[in-house]
Amino acid sequence: MDGLAAPSPSHSGATSGGGASHRKRKLPPSSLSDATADEDDDTTAPSSPSTSPSSPSRPSSPSSSHSDDDDDDSLHTFTAARLDGAPPSSSGRPPKPESSTVSAAAAAAAAAAAPKPDSASAAAGDGKEDPKGLFTDNIQTSGAYSAREEGLKREEEAGRLKFLCYSNDGVDEHMIWLVGLKNIFARQLPNMPKEYIVRLVMDRTHKSMMVIRNNIVVGGITYRPYTSQKFGEIAFCAITADEQVKGYGTRLMNHLKQHARDADGLTHFLTYADNNAVGYFVKQGFTKEITLDKERWQGYIKDYDGGILMECRIDQKLPYVDLATMIRRQRQAIDEKIRELSNCHIVYSGIDFQKKEAGIPRRTMKPEDIQGLREAGWTPDQWGHSKSRSAFSPDYSTYRQQLTNLMRSLLKNMNEHPDAWPFKEPVDSRDVPDYYDIIKDPIDLKTMSKRVESEQYYVTLEMFVADMKRMFSNAKTYNSPDTIYYKCASRLESFFSNKVASQLAQASTKN
């Protein structure tokens, strides 16, 4: 997804003072093509208006040939002028690079999984936020996060990847990178006038944290630090489309936070996000709750109709660019402590325990013979533990016999019920060919009778009841409510529930 954040007030008018006029603006929607989103925060979405108050809007097509030619011309001409001392001839201009399609990792990569490109529209002020998706889609495992961060860190150490922060300082190489970043913003934000993007990126009060791979800019974040107020305002952020799904968006934001804290002395970031960008900001630690004193930021940034003001507090101790190492060390410390208190890390060999018909074991095995069970804290009195055991004799042997008799009685009552006929035998696949494709865990009264008679399968009443309930559930899953099978299952289930309750009451009275 592509996008930008609200521009600094100094660029909304002709002046560059920190206390520029305080006006409200609307966030017009802007369409983007070839924008993608993934669940790993690698793409971003817009968070600011797509038009400048002082410049006319551009055509909405990001693939305009004139637009691309202008972008490339500006970079080639600028490079030649700075490094060679003279502009190149128009006929000798190098061909355009193939990877001209880009996507912004703007101060906002919005929703985590957007399967369609057009769902990554920029600055969609009329978009609706899905609160459920905001939390369910943004779930990210720390294991995957750490693996990506460590991979990118290795690339940085190898020199293939750099994260550098520069402003308009007049250095040739830095200026070339800034022009490249400007082109990324311009391609990805078609409704944002180029002149306005240039004004912010090249303004000396703004800084740009850039992702540089093999000496080529592949993305960046432009922001304005208000050092006297100790907060920064994010303006633009983008990652090229062919470098997405690699974690650059998150890594870029982490570098920005650490640089803003250590170099600029900032404690907070503020930005205006549209609804599509909120998801990305939440992943990066932004919230809609503004804790920063209003006196510190009011009048320094603009209010925008259709935008959501979001804040990120920069932690003063977190190693943002080395979070993966911190997480790994924390896990190691926790794992070592667990090993001191438990032997759960020991893996025992499996058990050769073959079963025959109806799931009844060929031979019995005492729980105490299972390796590791006692070491895990098991005690013999836990065998056959049941909530309903209080209704039976405290003696285990007597309890087992009473339980078996109860289950036999229940099965007898079930078999005699007039609605039990569909459940007495296993379903014949020759009569119902697709039954076992739909019902993966079949059960019937005959199979349950075999399990009861083995006196080895049902060690608690709850196990018996669970099988019976599954039988009713299977019937209701396979058959529609208007069928006789569904109705039989409903009536028989009600009968069974009442019978279990009455039998337990009788057993409790006797004991």
From Swiss-Prot:
It is found in: Nucleus. It comes from the Eukaryota. Acetylates histones H3 and H4 in vitro. Acetylates 'Lys-4' of histone H3 (H3K4ac), 'Lys-9' (H3K9ac), 'Lys-14' (H3K14ac), 'Lys-27' (H3K27ac), and 'Lys-5' of histone H4 (H4K5ac). Acetylation of histones gives a specific tag for epigenetic transcription activation. Operates in concert with certain DNA-binding transcriptional activators. ADA2 and GCN5 function to acetylate nucleosomes, opening up the promoter region. The ADA2-GCN5 histone acetyltransferase (HAT) module is recruited by WOX11 to regulate crown root cell proliferation and stem cell maintenance of root meristem. InterPro entries: Acyl_CoA_acyltransferase (IPR016181), Bromodomain (IPR001487), Bromodomain-like_sf (IPR036427), Bromodomain_CS (IPR018359), GCN5 (IPR037800), GNAT_dom (IPR000182). GO terms for biological process: chromatin remodeling; flower development; positive regulation of transcription by RNA polymerase II; positive regulation of wax biosynthetic process; regulation of vegetative phase change; response to light stimulus; root morphogenesis; transcription elongation-coupled chromatin remodeling. Keywords: Activator, Acyltransferase, Bromodomain, Chromatin regulator, Nucleus, Transcription, Transcription regulation, Transferase. The lineage of its organism: Eukaryota, Viridiplantae, Streptophyta, Embryophyta, Tracheophyta. PANTHER family: GH11602P, HISTONE ACETYLTRANSFERASE. It catalyses: L-lysyl-[protein] + acetyl-CoA = N(6)-acetyl-L-lysyl-[protein] + CoA + H(+). This is Histone acetyltransferase GCN5. Residues 168-315 form the N-acetyltransferase domain. SUPFAM superfamilies: Acyl-CoA N-acyltransferases (Nat), Bromodomain. It comes from Oryza sativa subsp. japonica (Rice). Residues 1-152 are annotated as: Disordered.
